Amino acid sequence: MFRLGFVASPETGHEIYQGKLAIPYLTPSGVIDIRFRSLNNDNGPKYLSRPGATTHIYNISALTQDSSMLVVCEGEIDTIIATQVGFTAVGLPGANNWKPYYSRVLDGWEKIMLFCDGDNAGREMAKTISRELDNVFPVFMPDNQDVNDVFLTEGADGLRRRVGA
């Protein structure tokens, strides 16, 4: 479904991506972008994008699902977890990557639940998106935790309880 990969032996000039999780941004017509996530606690950045890449909504195909509620997550991994739990979910590639035109893409959903990390960036993301869309309901994860942390400690039911499901 998400077609994740691992960069074992990168092409010359792309060594920076070695050992990273490859996260493709898929559309019905194919891959439109790819981001890379560090799998260890090295000193480098947690996420890398290709030079010159623009931001996109992750898991855009979820927008075609028949559902009254959409979950918007902060990050690709959180989006994958939310989807596996059973939510119709899309993600932003980080809390600070909201683009004003995303409101047109997300308009029309009966209810949009924002799964926000329990930090300042998550709170700012909630404020920004809530100013642009009327049907937004922020769901904050505990302090310094994200969807993945809650899933690992409380399981799928812990996430479902947060939205009353």
Task: Indicate where each model-derived feature is located.
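Phosphate-handling DNA/RNA-contact segment within nucleic-acid enzymes
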Residues: 2-110, 125-126
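Short, acidic/turn-prone active-site loops that include or flank metal/cofactor-
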Residues: 93-98, 117-119, 141-144
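A polyampholytic, Gly/Pro-enriched intrinsically disordered region
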Residues: 112-118, 154-165
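Hydrophobic anchor at the start of a short beta-strand
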Residues: 89-90, 112, 135-138
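Acidic beta-strand-to-loop metal/phosphate-binding motif
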Residues: 72, 109-121, 140
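Short, surface-exposed amphipathic charged segments that create phosphate/polyanion-binding patches used
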Residues: 104-108, 148-161
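Glycine-centered helix-coil hinge/cap
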Residues: 59, 75, 134, 155-156, ...
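Short, aromatic/basic amphipathic alpha-helical patches
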Residues: 124-134
